[in-house]
């Protein structure tokens, strides 16, 4: 799905928009920014966490009831925040972004709490260029520290 959320020209811009959407709970923007692969992973994780198979199929086929789809997206935001639990999501920043062909890796950082030290790595976003030159999010790979 191409929308205003993901028509930005650079993977770093799309990655920053994705981080902002997680921070502010913009669940529909998060979904719009996910690639087909990213959406499949999100539905698979939800299935493993108890999502009904019929609901999952409707979500995958883009025919879900608006209320069940909204509930799924809210759970997705909670899951992404849980994945990033070792950092304050409101302080996440997109650092370097390495592009190789139609694939990009955006490195996520968070400010260090120790004076005089560099930002800390918080994870990576893997992106791919889809049809029409649109960058989308394939996967969040958090660096988890703590419980």
Q: What is the meaning of each model-derived region?
A:
Residues 1-45:
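Short, low-complexity N-terminal intrinsically disordered segments enriched in polar/charged residues
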Residues 95-147:
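Short beta-strand edge/turn micro-motifs at domain boundaries
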Residues 34, 43-46, 50, 85, ...:
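Generic preference for flexible, low-structure residues
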Residues 50-118:
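Surface-exposed, charged secondary-structure patches
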Residues 1-10, 83-91, 98-99, 121-125, ...:
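Short secondary-structure boundary segments
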Residues 17, 24, 65, 128-129:
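Intrinsically disordered, low-complexity regions enriched in Ser/Pro/Gly/Gln/His and often acidic
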Residues 26, 39, 77-80, 143:
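Amphipathic alpha-helical interaction segments
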